[in-house]
Amino acid sequence: EEKVISNVFEDGDRWFNTGDLIKTMDVGFSLGRKHYQFVDRVGDTFRWKSENVSTNEVAEILNTFDQVNMANVFGVKVPQSEGRAGMVAFNCAIKDFKWNEFSEFVSNKLPSYAQPVFIRIIEELETTGTFKLKKNDLREEAYHLDKVSDDNVFVKKPGENKYVPLDKDYYEVIMNGSAGF
């Protein structure tokens, strides 16, 4: 029922919101019919540093790093910053994780605006009944230390090329808007 939208174009109409973004296109011959092209999934993109970021594209790249089992990428709000910063959640063997190699991998494979600012190491990624990765709860919990106390959260500070554990002091710097993202 939450995916059914009412009164979109006229009173009483009902539409099923699939989350797909499509556009009409001219194929050169239409025979009086409209043609549509799939563009993207709504909610699977976010804006950061005035650029559109596809969560699926970033996840596909991060999944090629040998120590990332499955990446779930989403955008999160940062105080005093426009748009949403990239964040990724994945599970891995944290003791053996090669942070320097991962940081270099991210810098080489992704443009700066698409590089995750935050990383959350989690026990297990949740999926829907159709095996899509769940993002809503992760997006809401984001990097907030009071909501993710059991997980390890890392941050890439502005101007730096490595991920470091997010501690309470730097969390406060982020929350008061003076981190400079």
Model-derived segments and their meaning:
Residues 2-114, 124-133, 137, 167:
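AMP-binding/adenylate-forming catalytic core of the ANL superfamily
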Residues 20, 147-152:
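Short, charge- and proline-biased low-complexity linear segments
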Residues 109-133, 150-176:
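AMP-binding/adenylate-forming catalytic domain of the ANL superfamily
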Residues 178-181:
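Long, low-complexity intrinsically disordered regulatory regions
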